[in-house]
Design a protein with these regions (language model features):
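Short, aromatic-rich amphipathic segments at membrane interfaces
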Residues: 161-196
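Internal/C-terminal transmembrane anchor helices
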Residues: 233-263
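N-terminal edge beta-strand
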Residues: 42-71, 284-293
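Bacterial N-terminal signal peptides
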Residues: 19-28
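C-terminal soluble domains/tails of integral membrane proteins
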Residues: 261-423
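Juxtamembrane interface at the cytosolic side of transmembrane helices
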Residues: 202-244
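Short beta-strand and strand-turn-strand segments in soluble, beta-rich domains
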Residues: 53-54, 99-116, 338-355
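Membrane-proximal low-complexity regions enriched in glycine and acidic/polar residues
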Residues: 64-157
Length: 423
């Protein structure tokens, strides 16, 4: 009797403990706030540094109201350092990366061509792009432009916060149909969508309840285990199954015919890729400069990339190195950029670039220059992971500037030796 009493108390204590754990879990879940993170940081450093280089990005507006249009423009360079682990962008799609449908994408243009579908871009070429958006859902949203590459997935570019004011209920997305009528596709056909979802949910629930009320999983397992698998489904149940299949087929066929009759003029979803996208001329690697990467190191504790170059100025004006751009980050030489640059702060190191010789490279002159790129953003944006890549290589674009205002972007890439001890 004492054993029984202790067993009962143990069971009651276990139940109470389980109840306390469940209540504590519920309380912690109630205290959870919305998630807020930059997902591009999770991508490998080599993927972001050696695939694409985004520059001259501009967000036309960062404060808009619902239904207001805004755009993202810029230039996209397909790096020659493209890694072998990822298929080259023979099939890719320019899109935006944003937390849900906070804005509607009205159009995308690459190389001056409207590109609503996938396209082919060439390695070593630079393309101008424009993405037109329409504010939809109020909030404070982080918006990227990104290129989705077959087998490589989405490769996001720099992001900017967009503040959308107003009421979501005021949003409209009017489209003119082939018959000349204009509809708001935000709400068009919503009643039919809800109706058909409800019909099939009810049908599915009825189907599940019918079979579960018969025997359930455990009962059917017992029948199979006892050697009665052939008797598990009765003739009546076979008839019910056949009639259910027939009813589903009839509903689909009949209402499909009704829909085709009501909407005779339709266009199928479009397929196919765009080719021969016009690339920009006189952009990356087109300047009067010969640049050779000699060697380099990456100091992990100091978040510092040190790269040595041999640079020859083949032009008629002196040139200065003003910027290093990689993975959306911009490291600036403060002696060249003397005023504030309009760019997202978390991606801008306005004093992140320094040179062993900051004097201009004269026409016809060859210089050995050590370029130091140092900033905490190497770590906060998780680019320090290049020290752990299988080939430990960096890539980016160096921007050279002349007194007349000319700018010459040049791709640089090469292996670096990681240093893990402070020097």
């Amino acid at each position: 009797m004492t054993t029984t009493m202790f067993s009962s108390l143990a069971r009651q204590g276990g139940r109470l403990w389980a109840l306390v754990l469940a209540a504590a879990l519920a309380l912690t879940m109630a205290a959870i706030g919305p998630a807020d993170a930059h997902g591009e940081k999770s991508q490998a450093a080599f993927l972001r540094m050696r695939t694409l280089n985004w520059y001259d990005l501009k967000w036309s507006k960062t404060n808009v109201t619902v239904n207001e249009e805004y755009e993202i423009t810029g230039k996209l360079y397909i790096m020659n350092a493209w890694p072998a682990a990822i298929e080259v962008p023979n099939q890719c799609f320019l899109n935006t990366g944003q937390p849900g449908a906070m804005a509607a994408r009205l159009g995308v243009w690459v190389g001056g061509q409207f590109t609503p579908r996938s396209m082919k871009l060439e390695v070593g070429k630079t393309y101008a792009f424009r993405v037109l958006l329409k504010a939809r859902r109020p909030g404070h949203w982080h918006t990227h432009v990104q290129l989705s590459v077959k087998t490589g997935g989405p490769i996001p570019g720099p992001g900017q916060y967009i503040d959308i004011k107003g009421n979501f209920s005021d949003y409209r997305d009017d489209v003119k149909l082939l018959n000349g009528t204009t509809v708001n596709i935000e709400t068009y056909g919503q009643a039919s969508i809800y109706l058909w979802h409800l019909v099939w949910i009810i049908a599915g629930i009825a189907w599940i309840l019918y079979w579960f009320n018969k025997r359930g999983f455990v009962g059917r397992f017992a029948w199979v285990a006892s050697g009665k698998a052939e008797e598990l489904i009765t003739p009546q149940e076979r008839i019910v199954g056949a009639l259910s299949l027939l009813a589903v087929l009839l509903v689909v066929i009949i209402f499909y015919a009704i829909t085709v009759s009501n909407y005779p003029n339709t266009i199928p979803l479009q397929a196919g890729d765009f080719h021969n996208i016009q690339a920009l001329e006189n952009e990356v690697n087109s300047g009067p400069i010969t640049i050779k990467y000699v060697n380099g190191t990456y100091k992990v504790p100091g978040r510092e990339l040190l790269a040595n170059f041999k640079i020859t100025n083949n032009g008629k004006e002196p040139l200065r190195i003003g910027e290093f751009s990689t993975a959306g980050l911009r490291f600036l030489n403060p002696d060249v950029f003397t005023s504030k640059v309009a760019y997202p702060d978390y991606l801008l190191a306005d004093r992140g670039l320094s040179l062993s010789d900051n004097s201009p490279i004269a026409p016809g002159e060859t210089k050995d220059i050590a370029v130091t790129v140092q900033d905490a953003r190497w770590d906060t944006e998780r680019l320090s992971g290049l020290a752990y890549d299988v080939d430990s290589s960096f890539a980016g674009v160096l921007f050279f500037f002349s007194p007349s205002g000319a700018r010459y972007p040049m791709e640089v890439t090469g292996p670096v030796i990681p240093t893990f001890m402070p020097v």
